[in-house]
Amino acid sequence: MGFVKVVKNKQYFKRYQVKFKRRREGKTDYYARKRLIVQDKNKYDTPKYRLIVRFSNRDITCQVAHSRIEGDKIVCAAYSHELPKYGVKVGLTNYAAAYCTGLLVARRLLKKLGLDRLYEGLKEANGEEYYVEPADEGPNAFRCNLDVGLMKTSTGARVFGAMKGAVDGGFNIPHSVKRFPGYDAEAKEYSAETHRKHILGLHVAEYMRKLEEEDEDAFNRQFSQYIKLGIVADDLENMYKKAHENIRSDPKRDRKPKKDVSKEPKRWNAKKLTNAERKQRVVEAKAAYLKELQGEEMES
């Protein structure tokens, strides 16, 4: 069939159907979303969970959610801005921080469900291929699928660092090693040591040493926060190892203290008077005026 020009006449506009709002905004891939949320028809009212990973300029968000008619329900969430509590105060958007955030959301949700003792995951981050095994007695491991949104799923992407952290934390997520750092597509071989370096921030440490030797001004500019906090390249591995231990020991989220609502809120405009208050103000104004007149008469 040849090229047919679209005639935008009355019939065209009468039948025109707009796409979903988030498709028009370019925020949601509904082709992928449909396959992530549609559950098997023989699993009645069984949620299909997703590990949602999103990156911003200064933060990493990891959420476990499932879909409902009224909208997605967030079961648990973790953010990289929580990592300073566990000892990681810089580099909150790199691969190592993504791994820590994924580990945090996994341990937090398993603790919430009471499965943290049953499924401890991989305690030492070594980059090896790991899949959680179901326990002989008790419930199965928590299963979810990775939701990357509109991100490119290239080999070594940070989104897979968050997924690896969640898997090592005890989640059952279907995956392979083909997208992890250290996988060679030509040789079809996986280097766990390369992946381990990324998990523990050793690739950042190597770049710090290299940049400091080649261009000190660029080093001072790019790693100013590291310098301010006194963190050198040799400290990174121990910093991330301690963070993993701290996350496992206490994944619970700190609740913000409730605001004291007993105090009256500050007003930026005059309070509206009631009818009785307005009448009383008129009476007071009349009395003051009469008193002033009497005072003038006495003087005269």
From Swiss-Prot:
- Which GO cellular component terms, listed alphabetically, does the Swiss-Prot or TrEMBL entry include? cytosolic large ribosomal subunit; nucleus
Q: What does this protein do?
A: Component of the ribosome, a large ribonucleoprotein complex responsible for the synthesis of proteins in the cell. The small ribosomal subunit (SSU) binds messenger RNAs (mRNAs) and translates the encoded message by selecting cognate aminoacyl-transfer RNA (tRNA) molecules. The large subunit (LSU) contains the ribosomal catalytic site termed the peptidyl transferase center (PTC), which catalyzes the formation of peptide bonds, thereby polymerizing the amino acids delivered by tRNAs into a polypeptide chain.
Return the Basic and acidic residues bias intervals: 246-267
Please describe the quaternary structure of this protein: Component of the large ribosomal subunit (LSU).
| Entry keywords, A to Z | Cytoplasm, Nucleus, Ribonucleoprotein, Ribosomal protein, RNA-binding, rRNA-binding
Check the record and name the SUPFAM superfamilies matching this protein: Translational machinery components
Q: Where is this region: Disordered?
A: 246-276
Question: Which protein is depicted?
Answer: Large ribosomal subunit protein uL18
Give the species. Toxoptera citricida (Brown citrus aphid)
